[in-house]
Structure formats: C-alpha cells, structure tokens
A protein has these predicted regions:
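N-terminal membrane-targeting/pre-transmembrane regions
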Residues: 1-42
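Phosphoinositide-dependent membrane-docking surfaces
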Residues: 15, 110-111, 122-137
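Alpha-helical transmembrane spans
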Residues: 30-95
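Conserved beta-hairpin
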Residues: 77-123
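Hydrophobic/aromatic beta-strand elements that line small-molecule binding cavities or substrate pockets
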Residues: 102-103, 127-130, 154
Length: 178
C-alpha cells in the first residue's frame, strides 16, 4: 500500500562505512577521476613496450622506469585518496548511533539541520537541487555539484522506496539516477 507523503523526515546517522562508500562513489563513479590516472598509466606502458621494441642498449632500463612510473604513480594517487578518506572518516568521529543532520523533505524543498553544531538551517528548493543518486542502500542528494547530503536506508519516517519516489517526483527523472 503506497502513501502520498507531504513531508518525510530523515534523521541521518552516518557510519564510517557509508561515508567511505560515498567518497569512492563521488570520486570514481560520479566525477570519473580514475580516467586520467588510467590514461597516464596506459600511455607510459605503451612507451615502455615501444622502448623494448627498439632493442637498443638501454631500452630495458628505460622500459622498466616507464613501467614503474606508469603503474606506481596512479597507485600512489588512488592510495593517497583512500588514505585521506580514512583520515577524514576518523576525524569526523562518525558513530552509527549519533545523529549528524536532519533532513525534512517537503513539497517546497529540503531543509538541512545540523545536529552536531549550532548553525542556521539550510533551505534548498527542489529547482536548485543539482542531482540525486540512489546507490548501495543510500541516497546521495547533491544540493550543488560539489556538496551532497547522504540519506542512508531505514533512517526516514517512511519506507526507503517512498523516500526515493518522493525525491524523484519533485526533481524529475532527468535529475535522478539509480
């Protein structure tokens, strides 16, 4: 039985796993930041094989250096990113039972209330919301291209599919993925 909700309230309690999953999604799936390191790696590997085909005196050394740099730098890039995400998650002190923010979804827009510190609530109309994604049991609500709020499953006062339907109905199919 489906209900037509006029307001849905999501009291968000984030854990480290959800935060890290979002960071990986944002970096690699949404912003596609894996393409340049992969392209760099591919180019250097091709040059390494070309150097080996030259059969000159130092071509083996040049090929080895190109392979080490071509594989090593992208690995360092990804490793540094994952390390920074781990440090951010630890610094944020995310505990599954602590509310981080509350997001009432209303017909006129979204209101974000910070539950960790005293600050003015943020009001965002549906027209100005950039995009919404539904991935891995969580809705990523991007209020701008660089700022998202996470709405994990089973934390709203409505079933998860109703929350997603509510958002899709107000944003439109073009702004919703998942």
């Amino acid at each position: 039985m489906d209900f037509d909700y006029s307001d849905i309230v999501v009291t968000v309690k984030l854990d480290e796993k959800t935060f890290k999953r979002f960071a990986r999604f944002d970096m690699f799936s949404r912003r596609k930041k894996w393409i340049r390191p992969a392209l760099f790696s591919l180019i250097l590997i091709v040059f390494a094989f070309i150097a080996l085909l030259a059969r000159k005196e130092q071509s083996g050394v040049i090929a080895a250096v190109l392979l080490v740099v071509g594989i090593g730098l992208p690995l360092v890039y990804v490793g540094t990113f994952l390390s920074q995400v781990n440090m951010q998650a630890a610094r944020a002190n995310l505990k599954p039972d602590q509310p981080v923010y509350t997001v009432p979804l209303r017909d006129e827009g979204v209101r974000i209330v910070n539950d960790r510190k005293e600050e003015e609530p943020q009001e965002v109309s549906w027209d100005s919301i950039h995009r919404a994604y539904r991935k891995n049991g969580c809705i990523y609500l991007y209020v701008t291209p660089s700022k998202a709020f996470l709405l994990p499953s089973k934390q709203a006062d409505a079933p998860d599919h109703e929350v997603w339907d509510f958002i899709r109905k107000r944003l439109g199919e073009g702004k919703c993925k998942g």
